[in-house]
Regions:
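Alpha-helical segment of the N-proximal tetratricopeptide repeat
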Residues: 442-475
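Metallo-beta-lactamase
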Residues: 108-109, 133-144, 199, 204-382, ...
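Feature captures hydrophobic
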Residues: 468-474, 481, 485, 495-655
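Conserved beta-strand hairpin/beta-sheet module of binuclear metal-dependent hydrolase folds
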Residues: 99-164, 289-293, 297-303
């Protein structure tokens, strides 16, 4: 989950002069909350017992700061979650999940053998005792939170049992909240000097650095909404993501693995301790594994099995995941280790203890993902489209009894739509929907059809009054797209999103609705999660990926007549890229040296890293001689000017 796209996201200020406070929970919302509370065993104490089990220490106030005193993590603003009873403005099931995720500290999972640092990032860091030292699993998103978590462990455990070296670091999968903090616990120099093993799944290096580079701008913009980064914490604001509290806002780093586990899995001895690895690539992440430690009877389920139904397609955008394969990987875990594993722990949330409970967790999670897949195809093969699937489907039977399968992050609703997309694509098969006009063109016609803006607004307000918020959103969205300066319409649509957000069980859905409402009101706060990428992360981005990303920024409309070959030479990394421009397309040929380029540009890869991190700009580098241009300098400058920066603040809820 949870990646470096946040580094590209900027605060968003969509000005509106009519800033209103959020609405209170409506009667319809209060009734929906009460109905859900009645049918779920919200008073089941087992998860709360597991969440606090083995707690040894905590960071005071949950406050972590950076070198310059900037706040990286702060749980003080979330003290409202101390209340047991959910307010009317928060789904009671999500409130329960948020309170569980709010538990923070150092926890002993297997006495004297395994510990976890939880509640100081969206993810969890696990520390395992080897024969002579420590094995670290998933060192969080930010270097600052990882360092604080490691210090908490050292101050608590090592002061009692003695200081031991870090012998290995395990990256369970290719999302940055599971490796980005590695520089906070070990340096590259220490890895080389101490021969520290860094173990990751096959394909990790390519996926960890390349993912989201091409589409990072749009993903980052949507992520601000999904994670509630432009919302203040509180009962009417950001409460939780479902997967964890929120994203930390520190420095994201990277280290290259020293070894990878193949697709066939492997049995490894790490610091004298036996590990069994099972490949899980193509489930929650493209490169992923789970592992079992036989001497400790401990199963690490990574992000394949957590205490929620995960995303088949995340709201920020990604490639669709395979729910069928996901269910089969969980079944393989159940067959291989069910009945033997006495504790299951993951990269998020709290552990599950007891062989029977671990097997039950795996079985229920397997069933939940299989249900998403099979129910989608059952209905699709009877003619249902992605617009109809969710309304024709009741939740899986297990979801009413096992909180670990509930829609706290992913949902049955958009998981089925994603599965439909995986098999059938974006189109529902109806030719009326094959090439509809864009909203900016169709919306004014809907307004006219309704008899004018006042009548459409009245219809939307009537839908709000009746508690039909989905219909209200559809009506009022048309009006806002037709008349974005109509602040009565914006206010009514924001009120609609308030209620939809309050009712949402998914933390991601809640955040998205409430962020949309804040945008309509012009009430966003500066983004609370704005990670900086360290040089180690940027340097790991393959040069070929950088030039592919650059090509996506080429303005084909303005450059349709441009033709040429721009040869890049990177002396320090001994790389060459020939960029062929023709017919409105820019095609980088990595590793190719053109015989007769239009211009040759010599630039060190290290200098290119400075450009990517914002430490240097091309014009200044050309003036200083750090970039040397031979050949048609004017043609190069004309080509270079055809790469405008993407707007990280593009509109979502208005045209």
């Amino acid at each position: 989950m949870k990646k470096a796209w946040m580094a590209m996201a900027l605060p968003v200020l969509l000005a509106a002069p009519d800033v209103r406070a959020q609405d209170a929970a409506s009667a319809a919302t209060r009734a929906a909350q009460a109905e859900l509370a009645k049918r779920l065993p919200l008073d089941d104490p087992q998860d709360f017992k597991n969440a606090v089990r083995g707690k040894l220490a905590e960071i005071a106030g949950g406050l972590i700061t950076g070198k310059d005193g900037q706040i990286i993590w702060d749980r003080r603003a979330y003290a409202f979650l101390d209340a047991e009873e959910a307010p009317d403005t928060v789904n009671p099931s999500l409130w329960r999940q948020a309170r569980l995720n709010a538990v923070h500290g150092l926890f002993e999972v297997v006495p004297g053998k395994i510990w976890q640092v939880r509640g100081y990032d969206i993810s969890v860091m696990t520390i395992i005792r080897g024969k002579s030292g420590w094995i670290i699993v998933d060192p969080l998103l930010s270097e600052e939170t990882a360092a604080a978590g490691w210090k908490l462990f050292a101050d608590t455990v090592e002061t009692q049992s003695g200081k031991r070296p870090i012998k290995a670091v395990i990256f369970s999968h290719s999302h940055s909240d599971h490796f980005g903090g590695v520089g906070g616990i070990v340096s590259k120099e220490e890895v080389a000097r101490e021969k520290i093993r860094i173990i990751a799944p096959h394909g990790f290096s390519e996926e960890a650095t390349a993912e989201n580079v091409l589409a990072g701008g749009a993903m980052g913009r949507r992520a601000l909404y999904m994670f509630g980064a432009i919302l203040a914490p509180g009962p009417t604001g950001q409460v939780d993501t479902g997967l964890g509290p929120k994203l930390s806002s520190g420095t994201i780093g990277y280290m290259e693995p020293t070894e990878t586990v193949p697709a066939t899995g492997a049995s490894l001895t790490i610091d004298g301790l036996a590990f069994e690895f099972l490949d899980a690539g193509g489930t929650e992440a493209p490169a992923e594994f789970v592992f079992y430690i036989p001497p400790y009877k401990a199963l690490h389920t990574t992000e394949v099995v957590t205490h929620n139904l995960h995303n088949i397609l995340t709201l920020r955008g990604a490639q669709v995941r395979d729910a069928l394969h996901w269910s089969k990987v969980i079944d393989a875990m159940l067959l291989k280790w069910g009945g033997s594993a006495e504790v299951a722990m993951a990269s998020h949330h709290w552990p599950t203890w007891g062989a029977g409970e671990v097997s039950r967790l795996l079985s229920n999670q397997r069933g939940a993902y299989r249900y998403v897949h099979d129910r989608t195809l059952f209905l699709a093969n009877q003619g249902a489209t992605l617009h109809e699937l969710a309304d024709q489907t009741a939740e899986a039977p297990v979801q009413g009894a096992d909180f670990s399968t509930r829609s706290y992050y992913g949902t049955l609703n958009h998981g089925m739509k994603a599965t439909y997309q995986r098999y059938f694509g974006w189109w529902d098969g109806n030719p009326a929907n094959f090439n509809p006009p864009p909203p900016e063109q169709s919306a004014p016609k809907y307004v006219a059809l309704a008899g004018g803006a006042d009548k459409l607004l009245a219809a939307g307000e009537a839908a709000i009054a009746s508690g039909d918020y989905r219909w209200a959103a559809e009506l009022l969205n048309k009006l806002v797209f037709a008349e974005p300066a109509n602040f009565a319409a914006r206010s009514a649509l924001a009120s609609t999103y308030d209620q939809l957000g309050y009712q949402a069980e998914s933390g991601a859905w809640r955040n998205y609705y409430l962020a949309a409402a804040a945008s309509l009101r012009g009430a966003e706060i500066p983004a609370s999660a704005s990670n900086g990428q360290s040089r180690s992360f940027v340097s790991a981005i393959p040069t070929s990926v950088f030039f592919d990303a650059l090509a996506t920024r080429f303005d084909a409309a303005s450059g349709s007549g441009l033709k040429g070959v721009f040869q890049f030479v990177l002396p320090d990394s001994k790389e060459a890229v020939a960029v062929v421009v023709e017919g409105g397309v820019e095609f980088p040929r990595y590793g190719v040296t053109d015989a007769a380029p239009t211009a040759t540009i010599t630039i060190d890869r290290r200098t290119l890293d400075d450009v990517m991190t914002g430490l240097a700009q091309f014009p200044a580098l050309m003036q200083s001689g750090a970039i040397r241009i031979e050949g048609d300098r004017t043609a190069f400058l004309s080509w270079f000017a055809l790469h405008p920066r993407a707007d990280p603040r593009f509109n979502i809820v208005v045209p």
